[in-house]
Amino acid sequence: MAQFLTEDFLLDTEFARRLYHDYAKDQPIYDYHCHLPPEQIAENTRFKNLYDIWLKGDHYKWRAMRTNGVAERFCTGDASDREKFDAWAATVPHTIGNPLYHWTHLELRRPFGITGKLLSPATADEIWQRGNELLAQDSFSARGIMQKMNVKMVGTTDDPIDDLRHHKAIAADGSFNIKVLPSWRPDKAFNIEAAGFNDYMQRLEAAADTSISRFADLCTALNKRMDHFAAHGCKVSDHALDVVVYGEADEATLDGILARRLAGNQPSTEETAQFKTAVLLFLSGEYHRREWVQQYHIGALRNNNSRMFNLVGPDIGFDSINDQPLAQPLSRLLDAQGLRNALPKTILYCLNPRDNEVIGTMVGNFQGEGAAGKMQFGSGWWFNDQKDGMQRQMTQLAQLGLLSRFVGMLTDSRSFLSYTRHEYFRRILCQMIGRWVEDGEAPADIELLGSMVKNICFDNAKQYFAIEL
């Protein structure tokens, strides 16, 4: 019987242990997509306590706590920090089998060095006290934790209207050597059906100093803001395509759709598809010209609980997996980009694991141009960011494409403690390849497979994003 969370956690073959300890473990972290607040990095935030750094804003934990019968005031409400931590500690023993159980204890081990103790009501006092003692040290500031975890690059998620002053301040600080770059997230500029679209157009007009009344005006405004992002080192875009749509329209039609929306009229389903397609095609052309990477996160069903949305807002744990078809509209969208000779490097993530093979085969349709792994099937995302989900994604990527060209893991997280997800991913990767060797499905060539693991952990992403570190 294996012990829980030893140095060989998940490494169930000798070959896996060699791969992890000799090739994966000490690789730096290239976290190309996350939701860390750049302000906290710029200001080198010091966290008040374990709640402040660990539970605040964590919708994964809130979902588990609600499922465990914890009242909302202990999740997002007015309970004290310690009361919220205690509610989490009481929930943790019930999360066995959920990735939260592994994540929790990996995060206690690194960076806190708390080992041999499982979080529960019986250990809550000791862990609370020890964690808070460490957080009082300079080395446990936001930047200190990033340095402890050997992070080399972080890509935050930023709106086109953001002024990026925090990124500018970080870049100007010669004492901090981790790249913190903005990523362009223009969802609000193409979600024409959204309630806040007209208000957002006014804010975009102000940020770009451009009046927007026609489709060409919107493109001009977005182009100006992309120039601003490029000046701050941006090389990556990201888009939430909850449902993939495709529709063709000429510019006069697009002008009419935009004018009617700005006048307060809701677009039809067809008009929404036409407008979104046009914006995405314009953007992809700019990404290709600027040599940016585009990411599509596909298939979320958001804000399902209207009562809770009205009480506490979005992004607090009431989202789930969508089941809308995506193959045909996604194919047409990518094909249209290719026909314009404007298909940039692209990473596709699907939230519904049913779509793994759809994405795994779709990326193969558009590879080429002498770029290894130009089109990527992205790592297991959100509800798939767990052992089974990552194994499925990597297995299907290997079967349908080239695992060796995979750009690997990202945290997609708002927490400075989530870097152990890279460790978790690396252990799962080494476990999987080690089992292939054990079963005679891959050669026991440590240099060949070790190099492959090293590339997936760091080097492939470094080469793919082409950002100078």
Curated annotation (Swiss-Prot):
Q: InterPro entries recorded for this chain?
A: Metal_Hydrolase, Uronate_isomerase
Q: Which UniProt keywords are given for this protein, alphabetically ordered?
A: Isomerase
Q: What is its EC number?
A: 5.3.1.12
Q: Which Pfam families match?
A: UxaC
Protein's UniProt keywords contain Lipid biosynthesis:
no
The Gene Ontology biological process terms listed for this entry are:
D-galacturonate catabolic process; D-glucuronate catabolic process
Q: Does the keyword rRNA processing apply?
A: no
* MF term (GO), any: glucuronate isomerase activity
Please give the catalytic activity noted in the UniProt record: D-glucuronate = D-fructuronate; aldehydo-D-galacturonate = keto-D-tagaturonate
> Which pathway features in its UniProt record?
Carbohydrate metabolism; pentose and glucuronate interconversion
Gene3D superfamilies hit by this protein:
Metal-dependent hydrolases, uronate isomerase, domain 2, chain A
For this protein, the record's SUPFAM superfamilies field holds: Metallo-dependent hydrolases
Per the record, the similarity remark reads:
Belongs to the metallo-dependent hydrolases superfamily. Uronate isomerase family.
Name of the protein: Uronate isomerase
